């Protein structure tokens, strides 16, 4: 099974890495329901869904292990396996032959082996966190043909350099000398001496940033493409030419063509044949007229010898004899200024034949002619060059003027475009305003129609006003249409006039540019003659351009003023119309609002009446509830008064009974202890010996009838916050008491019993002494008790009475009194308040002090 994708970063032989060299000693394996091998650890382990769980690659010496991504994570030792398949979980157990004492780190990577006897000593291999080999300790040779203990890798798994090594490899170059950049491309090599089988030396190769070879520097080596070491490349890495070292010297070809500077000189002399060059020596021989032919011959000779003037300054120039032996070249279109050409030169034989032998012929040496002609020729050439430069400068200045004019025209065009755009925007705004006016008019017409439909009998004034409004609105619409047409006509006329002026200017510029080009293309003579005329024309042209610019500026200003005036007129007209229209709208809306206000006031009056009636009902219900509550509280107070009077009568009866018992003891000379017993037990719960036994649950006789006193009812205060058929809570009572500082139901006067005559001492029945033990508590003021400190858990009666007094005195004052009674202050040092006032908050509860007692 080939697994090249597991270690794609590791170079090796034929696409295999060092963990993929399998042996033939494979064990048996099975398949699951999906056809995946499940029991052979040398292949892979899959789950029920076909996903790879674990993969162990089998090699000669040790068993490789892989993680879930296929990277090597560790190696087991041994090569003998005994498989035990689990039918449920497809797990297997391995029994390894512990041939080596392998050591692993926490990630399962081998970190060292004790000395072994195998060929490939993997006990020296080291791996990084990605499973790539990063170095090896000194070990033996391996079957990879290079020494991995010298390889170094970067964080991406690419080789970045190697230490010095001596092992040769089968790839044709030495890894020890290779250098790589950050992307893993080779960028250079150090000097090396290993020969390779690829036909060129990698040690001399250099690469650019894209990994391509830009040049080769070894002149004695050739690469495998066949071109030499002088190959050159351009910026785009394309081959320019194949150039050898001796190529330029061997491949030089002698050209018979005339040099370019000589051709230029020949053309210049041919064009200037009638100028001062030919008549240079006429100053000395003006008196001798028969020598015209000789002068013509001399000019012809000079003209034939002028191509040699370019070689005067050359050191290898051979002297030329007076007899003309050099080849004479003439242009086909050349026209000689002499009349006797046949007598002067025979061009077919390339020799100068002199027919007038009888005449005195003066043969001037060529060197003298050249020395005489050269300074004049140079002066003329300089003068012509200066004139040409002047012409070029003037043409450049004229071109700059044209460019400025074009720029001004462009700016004027842009300004006109902006004005046109502004006109367009103003037209669009006018159209939008017209649409809005139409929509508002339509809404007005709809409202008018609605008002007409509602008011079946409108008055004549309303009809007249509506008709006037309609007429005015129609007039407004008509005027708006007219303004639209006027604006469109003005914009079209301005566009047409601007386009015409623009076309005229462009035509004038084109004509003038053509004239300039024609004049610049003229010859030297015509240019010299027409130079003054050109200057005048240029001045006139500049004046015309200035006039055109001024005219364009004036036209633009006038157009802008017209547009501004038209826009201001339109705005003023529209503002006046809109103001009148707004006044009318405000009148109509004010009328509608007044009508709606009258309707709303009528509806509000009805609502206010209904609310007043409901409020009066609620007040009557509240008053009735308060009265019911007052009556109930009066009944409750009457019941409490009756119970208290009953208990008071019982206490008085017990006191009388105790007094009678004391009198009887004095009469019968009783012991002091029995007297104390009678005094300490006035109710008679402990049975005395002199009294007969009485059952403790014997019923008491009914109390005597009491006449109902005449009740004097005080005026009650109604509670306006109480709802009907609802009992007030304690919180409501306390709040009302605190607000009004008095009870809603004031205490009624208790009825006073009529004075009864003192009864005669007589023998009372024993049933009076038989009271239940839980009816009335024993009062403190009847039994002598030792004095004691006020305690929180005692005197509950006083606390309850103080809470009941909150109805009269207010809840906050009652709570303040309770806190001052039962909660002593947290400290007794008043100087702490000045030093650290936070002690007050730390001790006890917050104090309510309305009287500033502290």
From Swiss-Prot:
Protein name: Fibronectin-binding protein PlpA
Biased composition annotated in UniProt, kind: Polar residues: 311-320, 411-428
Domain of life assignment: Bacteria
GO CC, one annotated term: plasma membrane
Compositional bias annotation for Pro residues: 746-764
Annotated stretches, region: Fibronectin-binding: 91-109
Compartment annotation: Cell membrane
UniProt membrane topology term: Peripheral membrane protein
Regions that span the bilayer: none
Regions of compositional bias (Basic and acidic residues) in chain numbering: 258-267
Coiled-coil residues: 384-622
Function text: Binds immobilized fibronectin, specifically the gelatin/heparin-binding domain.
Note: Absent in high passage extracts (passage 164) versus low passage (passage 14) due to a 17 bp duplication that adds a premature codon.
Disulfide bonds: none
Annotated region (Disordered), positions in chain: 1-33, 247-327, 411-434, 743-766, 835-854
Keyword Membrane recorded: yes
Low complexity compositional bias, start-end: 1-24
UniProt entry keywords in alphabetical sequence: Cell membrane, Coiled coil, Membrane, Repeat, Virulence
Main location: membrane
